[in-house]
Amino acid sequence: MPRLLIVHHSPTTLVQALTDAVVAGAHDDAIEDVEVVVRPALEASAADVLNADGYLLGTTANFGYMSGALKHFFDTIFLEAGGALTDDGSAGSVGGGKRPYGLWVHGRYDTTGAVRSVQSIVGALPWRQAAEVLEVLGDVGEQERAAAYELGGTLAALLAG
């Protein structure tokens, strides 16, 4: 059975609402035979990543970057999960991967730097972006929760085949 790993940093009620919607979408009744594993970013391991067939990542935008918790996750799993480094030690490109991923980011004013920072690291993993990035600014309402639900459902449905 394919496994979808959801890794998130949800320190506020707004971000937790998005996370809950993503998880609910991944568990949609119309999607069968996909195991959904949810891990806070500080608890996710390389084994979780290696045992998954697809990924959903959630983070806040903090000072123009992803959350420290999600960065810690990447620092912890990067090499073991197949990440490529360049000669100067920065993330290199593996040329596109097979495992699908999606991303949601919540910020107050701007999410650009957070999205860019995640994509630069993920670009060096054997993963491929399988859905539009969900970028949410400010309050989280029904429209934002619906988009998060759709993101979760999209990745789970891709794995279900």
Task: State each model region's role.
Residues 2-30:
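N-terminal beta1-alpha1 ligand-phosphate binding loop
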Residues 3, 14-18, 69, 117, ...:
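Charged catalytic carboxylate motif
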Residues 12-13, 105-110, 136-141:
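Short histidine/acidic/glycine/proline-rich micro-motifs that form metal-
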Residues 20-32, 78-79, 123-128:
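Short helix-loop-beta junction
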Residues 29, 128-161:
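Glycine-rich phosphate/pyrophosphate-binding loop and the adjoining helix
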Residues 29-45:
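A short beta-strand-loop structural module common to alpha/beta enzyme folds
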Residues 41-128:
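Helix-loop-strand module that forms the ligand-binding subsite of alpha/beta enzymes
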